[in-house]
UniProtKB/Swiss-Prot annotation:
Protein family membership: Belongs to the PPR family. P subfamily.
Mapped PPR repeat ranges: 179-209, 210-244, 245-279, 280-314, 315-349, 350-384, 385-419, 420-454
UniProt-listed NCBIfam families: PPR
Source species, domain of life: Eukaryota
UniProt-listed PANTHER family: OS03G0856100 PROTEIN, OS12G0638900 PROTEIN
Keyword Repeat tagged: yes
Keyword GTP-binding: no
Pfam family, one: PPR_2
Keywords of the record: Repeat
Entry coiled-coil feature ranges: none
Identification of the protein by name: Putative pentatricopeptide repeat-containing protein At1g02420
Length: 491
């Protein structure tokens, strides 16, 4: 065992230790994080995509490489691009290059991933062009899942009206499969990307054109903060003769727990058992979170034991919910004991687990232990997510630790984790504040080469910094590289 946090009286944070099995000591240089092998074809193609600025360059590289473009390879390349935030336009060229091969047909996974990449980068015209191309060559690839991917990106960046318009545009494109599953995809999108109120309003305006099923109501029940709204849909569902399943009950239990109506949640669990619907791990995890909201972390921990008695065993998410409760209560020793327990049961802490402790360290402004935790996270072969990166980069900025910030950035670039856009805003701000022109230029170039456009504020600051350092040729080179972005480059 080892101590990782000293007593922090100013923040009322108690001592706690972190298990050796959870956070075994390891040097960062020795950290073994899974990445693509150097000789892997997917990694080679990925580098071609991000290393080419022109369509002709990419085609020549692919043609001369001798790499056989199979469905599996293209799936892996597109997955790599998605999670590494690669160049969207060059990725589309790669996708079309493969489509043009005689006898080749993409997988539905490739299509949906390509559409996601385009949508994330606001390339909506290209999305509809690609869908039309796909309909002509292989209509079977377009599914309700495809529609949900597209609508999700539209809803994320546009209005509810534009999202519904895109829904009807899909109907005109592929009218033959337009049914309740598509209606459900629209509602799920609105619940996830807009608001429950928007989903409710669209449901009531369109429900007579479709036949709502159990999945429709399961979607509409999830996410409400008011139990009255959820109960109204529950009653409407029963009025249509639909029998609730475990998902239905879990959704309503979630509403009760978020509304701090824990007794209603327990009564509904009893009703589930009466109806011979067995509560699952999601049911218990929801209750654990609800007990934390009303300040009962000890009772929540007992739920972990209780669920085992019913033959349901906690997973990482269930443990994370209980750990979160103790972190909120500043009982970090108890939180760590749960980490110890989950590891002994063969469950590996994930990025969410680490983030619970990163949050505490961030509130305590404890730079040293945050860095130590990050090193050990990589050593335990757990890749940080965007939230982990933001906890760290903000702390590095507060302490003006350029070396740590640059190391985090290098790890992101090499290992492919985190959001370049979000992290770069903070990182470049730090580098500009400290007049670190070489480092700022390096980060900006790496970001552009990955296919990500820096924010206008960051670009203007770095451009000014480079001009003051008489790096005019480098500025021109940077502007040329940013030509891959269709939007105007700020002057």
């Amino acid at each position: 065992m080892m101590m990782i946090l000293k007593p922090l009286s100013s923040h009322h944070v108690s001592n706690f230790r972190l298990s050796v099995s959870f956070l075994h000591s390891v040097a960062l240089s020795d950290a073994k994080v899974p990445v693509e092998e150097e000789g892997d074809d997917a990694e080679t193609v990925f580098r071609m995509i991000n290393g080419s600025n022109l369509q002709v360059e990419l085609k020549e590289s692919l043609s001369s490489s001798g790499i056989h473009l199979s469905k599996d390879l293209i799936d892996r390349v597109l997955k790599r691009v998605r999670f590494s935030h690669g160049n969207p336009i060059q990725t589309l060229e790669f996708y079309r290059y493969a489509s043009a091969i005689r006898g080749f047909y993409h997988s539905s996974f490739s299509l949906d991933t390509m559409l996601y990449i385009l949508g994330r980068n606001r390339k909506f015209d290209q999305i509809w062009e690609l869908l039309i191309e796909t309909k002509r060559k292989d209509r079977s690839l377009i599914s309700p899942r495809t529609m949900q991917v597209v609508l999700g990106r539209v809803a994320k960046l546009c209005s509810v009206r534009q999202t519904v318009e895109s829904f009807w545009k899909f109907k005109r494109l592929v009218p033959d499969f337009f049914d309740t599953a598509c209606f459900n995809a629209l509602l799920r999108t609105l619940c996830q990307e807009k608001s429950m109120t928007d989903a409710r309003n669209v449901y009531h305006s369109l429900k007579h054109q479709f036949q709502p099923d159990l999945q429709t109501f399961n979607i509409l029940l999830s996410g409400w903060k008011s139990s009255e709204e959820a109960e109204a849909f529950f009653e409407e569902m029963k009025g249509k003769g639909l029998k609730p399943d475990v998902v239905t009950y879990n959704s309503l239990i979630d509403v009760y727990c978020k509304d701090r109506e824990i007794e209603k949640a327990y009564k509904l669990i009893d009703k589930m058992r009466e109806e011979e619907e067995t509560p699952d791990v999601i049911t218990y995890t929801t209750v654990i979170g609800g007990l934390g909201l009303i300040g009962q972390p000890d009772k929540a921990r007992e739920v972990l034991k209780e669920m085992k008695e019913y033959g349901c065993y906690p997973d990482v998410a269930a443990y994370n919910a209980a750990i979160r409760n103790f972190c909120i209560a500043r009982r970090l020793g108890d939180a760590d004991k749960l980490v110890d327990e989950m590891v002994k049961k063969g469950l590996s802490p994930n990025a969410t687990t680490y983030n619970l402790f990163f949050r505490v360290l961030s509130l305590a402004n404890d730079l040293g232990r945050s860095w130590e935790l990050y090193v050990r996270m990589l050593g335990n072969e757990c890749l940080p997510n965007t939230q982990s990166c933001m906890f760290l980069i903000k702390m590095f900025k507060r302490h003006e630790k350029v070396d740590m910030a640059m190391r985090l950035w290098e790890d992101m670039v090499v290992k492919g984790f985190g959001s370049y856009s979000l992290v770069s805003d903070v990182l470049l701000d730090l580098l500009c504040d400290l007049a670190k022109v070489e480092e700022a230029e390096k980060c900006l170039l790496e970001m552009v080469e990955k296919g990500h456009r820096p924010s206008n504020v960051s670009f203007k600051r770095i451009k000014l910094l480079m001009e003051l350092a008489n790096k005019h040729d480098e500025v021109n080179n940077l502007i040329q590289k940013m030509a891959i972005f269709s939007t105007e480059i700020p002057r």
